[in-house]
Amino acid sequence: MPAILPDIEPLRASREFRLLWLGQFISQSGSALRLVAIPYQIYLLTGSSLAVGLLGLFSAVPLITLSLWGGVIADRVDRRRMLLVTNTCLALTSVALAVSTQLGVASVPVLYLLTAVGSGFSALDQPARSALAPSLVERRLIPAAMALNQSQFQVSQVVGPALAGVLIARFGLAPAYWIDVATFLVATGALLLMRVPRGDVVIVHAAPLRALADGMAFLWSRPLLLATMSVDFFATFFAVSRAVMPYYADRVFAVGPEGLGLLYAAPGAGATVVALTSGWINRAQRRGLGILVSVAIFGLAIALFGLLPPTGFIAGLALLAVAQGADTVSSIFRHTILQLETPDALRGRLSALNLVFVAGGPQLGQVESGVVADLWSPEASVVTGGLACVGVVFVANVLVPQVARYRADLAHGAAVP
């Protein structure tokens, strides 16, 4: 049993990593509340899966345009201080959501606008957060640290949506947003307690455009990194089905807001099981092959979800859990490869480029699934998206066979093709 449990040595060995990890878990639980509340609020206002799907567009545009610059900034300043600024801005965005909802002025355009603003601040926040974490632990502990980060993220994706369903059903939307505000305050407190040694603060002095170009050139020169990011982008673009979950809760399963919360929480439950038994993942040798197999399972589970009848709510929860569990395995492998193969001075920029791929795919995928649902049907959107995800795996294996062959030497950082 201990061989499959997550390795918590990074939490024991580094006080700063422990503080970052705990604060991030609390704030992400609050953010998960918001990510249920906003789509549900828009669905209540419009009854349209397309309107919900357009949230992805308003989230993706600032994320893609600003995250690259967030990576450049993260490699030029103290990353902890940068996180203090972005955390504060994200908290203020949630305050605006709560106040506008309480005052009854949270129209669809207002919700789109605040989604875009929050996404922009997240685009600046996440590269710094991703780049800071591996610098707080020894190189040999990076795989375990990445698995722990996935664990806390996935647990938050269970806690947040499940709590959101209960809160929205019992108290309304505004309390969910206020709890999100409170979690950002806790995360800010954890950052204030951190003491990152000056020797761990990497400062890049190149001109911003040159620094950005250097990051892109490094990624382009590493087909392995580019391929693993691309697989995730296209897989999630086709298979992410968050935009149609309000439809499934309302029209297919007829389970109300509590059921919607469970539909959003089920993926996190599956991912949590994987993350909490991730010891075997840290010791896996064929990480590239693991990515391909995991993404294929993810796509198949989503396609099967789309075929369920109205009586299939419990089966649907199980399939969503399996899908996200598989995606979590892929994500741990991918993030580990990225951090092992990237010099610390480039981690901010590479984390930003990674964010464009791994967050841009799901956000744009919401638009894609909403459009297909509107033109065809929500069920067809889910089934075809899952099958397209499986197709992405086969294409990637043919075009970049070195992904399936990848191994890594944790002691020296040497990749084995």
Where is each model-derived feature located?
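Alpha-helical transmembrane-bundle signature of multi-pass membrane transport and export proteins
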Residues: 1-417
